[in-house]
């Protein structure tokens, strides 16, 4: 029994920022039964001249057509392609083609099934690997009132969850958190959990004394063409976070310049490495940064910069320069010792 009733889903427009590749994992939508981010990991390897293709988890409705040829190349070229085709019965055949040299491997992540099919298939596959069997068919319905709890699992705490969201810009998890917030505080007037979350966030902002007339929330993530916020409003939110008793947990969730997350390769060879905790934002026509950055004198600044352009080539370098210029504040003269 697959119970997806915890979340009341909103009806939102698609954000097609994917180059028309609907199978990219970062486009996975939130769901009450979200399991493993609905991702399938395909691994192809050349093992002593024999090409093997596997999928994790090994869901029965995913079939593999292995057409990869053995290559005599001396280097691993990564010339492997994965082409999924969905059949009328909902099963998916993934044709894997290309060439792979001895000792080489290739992998990719795809999202190919709906939430219910993926969850049921993953549970059945894992249970079978453990030596068990599940009889009967899968149905979507509320959990029967007379059902007995056999096992219970708890999510990581919020500090750990937002670390994954912010470090790696995980839109699916951000939307899931947004809807979970709505589900927790939903009332009859909200209609769906996105509207409930929007109301709760605005109430929190008002409580903190933050006015946000330009703020538009849709799904709670960066994967939206409707969401809006001004740089000043975002900076005020960061200042509120700085004053929070949970400031340390929040700041540590942000990517560190030149060190990890989406900032791992940026500012790596500059004096800014390790001096900023900054969340990045990227859409086809938008580049942004927001977070906390230190200057040459050890002062910490709330920093927000948003660039909108139809051709944002080089925009990330411009944003990096903002952080560098802020860091290069003139050195303050040392204060005279007090006797």
Give names to the regions the model predicted.
Residues 1-212, 296, 328-331, 335-339:
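Conserved serine DD-peptidase/penicillin-binding transpeptidase domain
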Residues 168, 178-339:
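Small-residue-rich helix-loop
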């Amino acid at each position: 029994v697959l119970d997806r009733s915890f979340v009341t889903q909103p009806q939102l427009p698609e954000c097609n920022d994917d180059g028309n590749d609907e199978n990219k994992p970062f486009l996975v939508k939130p769901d009450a039964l979200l399991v493993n981010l609905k991702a399938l990991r395909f691994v192809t390897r050349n093992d002593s001249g024999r090409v093997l293709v596997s999928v994790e988890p090994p869901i029965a409705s995913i079939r593999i057509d292995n057409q990869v040829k053995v290559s005599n190349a001396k280097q691993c070229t990564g010339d492997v392609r994965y082409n999924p085709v969905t059949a009328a019965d909902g099963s998916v055949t993934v044709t894997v083609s290309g060439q792979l040299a001895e000792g080489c491997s290739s992998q990719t992540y795809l999202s190919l099934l709906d939430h219910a099919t993926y969850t049921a298939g993953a549970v059945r596959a894992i249970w079978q690997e453990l030596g068990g069997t599940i009889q009967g068919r899968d149905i979507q319905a509320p959990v029967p009132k007379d059902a007995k709890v056999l096992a219970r699992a708890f999510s990581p705490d919020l500090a750990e969850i937002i670390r994954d969201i912010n470090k790696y810009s995980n839109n699916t998890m951000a939307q899931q958190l947004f809807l979970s917030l709505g589900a927790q505080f939903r009332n009859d007037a909200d209609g769906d959990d996105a509207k409930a979350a929007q109301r709760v966030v605005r109430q929190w902002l008002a409580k903190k004394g933050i006015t946000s007339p330009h703020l538009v929330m849709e799904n709670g993530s960066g994967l939206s063409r409707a969401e809006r916020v001004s740089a000043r409003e975002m900076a005020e939110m960061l200042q509120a976070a700085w004053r929070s008793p949970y400031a340390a947990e929040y700041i540590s969730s942000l990517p560190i310049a030149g060190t990890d997350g989406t900032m791992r390769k940026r500012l790596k060879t500059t004096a800014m490495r390790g001096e900023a905790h900054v969340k990045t934002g990227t859409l086809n026509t938008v580049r942004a940064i927001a977070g906390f950055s230190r200057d040459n004198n050890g002062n910490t600044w709330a920093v927000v910069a948003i660039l909108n352009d139809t051709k944002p080539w080089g925009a990330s370098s411009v944003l990096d320069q903002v952080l560098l210029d802020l860091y290069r504040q003139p050195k303050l003269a040392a204060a005279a010792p007090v006797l």
